[in-house]
A protein has these predicted regions:
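Active-site loop of short-chain dehydrogenase/reductase
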Residues: 14-15, 29, 60-73, 106-109
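Substrate-binding pocket helix/loop in short-chain dehydrogenase/reductase
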Residues: 29-30, 37-42
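Catalytic loop of short-chain dehydrogenase/reductase
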Residues: 67-92, 98, 102-105
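C-terminal helical subdomain
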Residues: 106-121, 129-170
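A short, exposed helix-loop element centered on a Lys and neighboring polar residues
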Residues: 53-54, 98
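Conserved amphipathic alpha-helix within the SDR
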Residues: 1-13
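Conserved NAD(P)H cofactor-binding loop of Rossmann-fold oxidoreductase domains
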Residues: 21-27
């Protein structure tokens, strides 16, 4: 995957916007979990962000900057019962994003962590949850928020943003 992305960058130039939107939701009691659950969530969510940043940041810096937006979750801020594998990876992803923001902001790369505090209206989530769709986050609305983040002037960069449906308690 890294080689393919490097080839795309070599052919088309540095990306202006990169979005890391990965979640592997493992829900089970801690005592039933296995270290493989943690390795899997960390590999899919944290390691993938590290690899994506390693491939894209250097070309973005050479090109004068860009935006790198990372999708977090409620679990980025607080863990819940039965969510330890998921929450540990989302916490780590938030910390990674904060570190990258501080390191690459001076070079013109806008790094932002978004907390998606709600259930996103997808086919899979509709199969798993019996929520009213009006109470779910619409992907196109999330995309609009990401577009706005990617186009912020350097004088007012957002480094963390909470997005949630109006029906979500917080």
């Amino acid at each position: 995957a890294c080689a393919a992305l490097q080839d795309v960058i070599a052919e088309h130039g540095a990306p202006k916007v990169v979005i890391h939107n990965v979640a592997e939701l493992i829900i089970k009691p801690f005592e039933e979990g296995h270290v493989d659950d943690y390795q899997s969530t960390w590999r899919s969510m944290v390691q993938s962000a590290v690899l994506l940043a390693q491939v894209t940041f250097k070309p973005m810096v050479r090109a004068g900057g860009g935006a790198f937006i990372v999708s977090g979750a409620t679990a980025s801020l607080r863990g819940g019962a039965r969510f330890s594998a998921f929450a540990s990876a989302k916490f780590a992803l938030r910390g990674l994003t904060q570190s990258l923001a501080r390191e690459f902001q001076p070079a013109g790369v806008h790094v932002c962590h978004t907390i998606l505090d709600g259930i996103i209206d997808t086919e899979r989530s509709r199969e798993l949850h019996s929520l009213d769709r009006a109470k779910m986050m619409r992907p196109e609305d999330i995309a609009e928020a990401y577009w706005q983040l990617a186009h912020q002037p350097r004088s007012t960069w957002t480094h963390e943003l909470d997005l949630r449906p109006a029906s979500e308690s917080f």
